[in-house]
Amino acid sequence: MSHVMNTYARLPVTFVKGEGVWLWDDQGNRYLDALSGIAVCGVGHCHPVLVKALCEQVSTLIHTSNVYHIQHQERLADRLTSLSGLEKAFFCNSGAEANEAAIKLARLYGHNQGINLPTIIVMERSFHGRTMATLTATGNRKTQAGFEPLLTGFVRVPYDDLEAVNKVAANNREIVAILLETYQGEGGVNFPQANYLQGLRRICDQNGWLLMLDEVQCGLGRTGKWFAFQHSEVMPDAMTLAKGLGSGVPIGACLAGGKAAEVFKPGNHASTFGGNPLACRAALTTLDIIEQEGLMDNAVTIGNFMWEEFGRRLQAWQDVLKIRGQGMMIGIELPVPCSELVPEALKRRVLVNVTSEKVVRLLPALNMQKAEAEQVVTEVSALITWFLESRVK
């Protein structure tokens, strides 16, 4: 009997080794990983440059308290602010913690303006984490069920709907911020219209609100740029990161700029482990690998190849399928729930995920090569075809 709490419906496999885009189970079977730990291992499993850096750091210094200056933390803050155009960084251990920091920042920003009940606009079908604040911000009733009462201070609107935001702006004087995923992951791999972020930026500027972008899943090169918001040339007031930042070593970050950068003062927020030397060394090395190996360009090249190949191989089903993607973030929406494809893919030694009940989600490592990508497309296309032939008439 396992003594691990029953919080996951785990698949019947135990992985013991990883290299690049491959994993091996405890029986010696090899699997092609098209999920990369849900967008965590962006440079692949156990990249040799990362392994060397971590071994060196473990033998030098693992942790000190944030009551002291931490050299690698300062370096990482410099790097992330330089890449993003934001000004300050707070480090924590996960995406949920990063979003919790953003929510606290927005509330404090509101109180500093004399707003007694600061309220944040959030989106339907969003996912921001499982702490109480981020769970409340998340737009998924199944995830929230059983954890009521949820927190106050949030107003929900449809994603990619500027008119809905304008209606809220006209009727609620306690709004202080908008929090959304630049591209939605858990909600079904959804991408907004080209002018959406510009419209949100304009509304925020008109009302003195903060625009806060959750790039926990879509950031750090996955879409072909360092951050997904850079496709829209819109500057947020705050942005959250995690997942791919540490290549598996837990680290999250909340970045802020402009009027949001100086909101937090000593004592307002903290994290015991956040930004420790080991985690920051992992993040710095990850950024080096992405940059030096041209992985953002590779994400675009291989991502486009996969998107086009899926379209070609699944052409017979084009009337019932929706294929969405940017870089190494790809979703294939089926007309019916398809969660059974995940264990079927596992039998074929390919790791994929189904989100929002009907969307096959692929989040490969940014350094996946064409031959490996072609294998993923071949296996997944065959699975989808098999599934649809038995479900769709």
From Swiss-Prot:
Catalytic activity reported: N(2)-acetyl-L-ornithine + 2-oxoglutarate = N-acetyl-L-glutamate 5-semialdehyde + L-glutamate
Pathway: Amino-acid biosynthesis; L-arginine biosynthesis; N(2)-acetyl-L-ornithine from L-glutamate: step 4/4
Modification N6-(pyridoxal phosphate)lysine occurs at: 243
Cofactor section: pyridoxal 5'-phosphate
Keyword field contains Transferase: yes
Gene Ontology cellular-component annotations: cytoplasm
Superkingdom to which the source organism belongs: Bacteria
Subunit structure: Homodimer.
NCBIfam families named in the record: argD, PRK01278.1
Misc remark: May also have succinyldiaminopimelate aminotransferase activity, thus carrying out the corresponding step in lysine biosynthesis.
Name of protein: Acetylornithine aminotransferase
Organism, scientific name: Nitrosomonas europaea (strain ATCC 19718 / CIP 103999 / KCTC 2705 / NBRC 14298)
Lineage: Bacteria, Pseudomonadati, Pseudomonadota, Betaproteobacteria, Nitrosomonadales
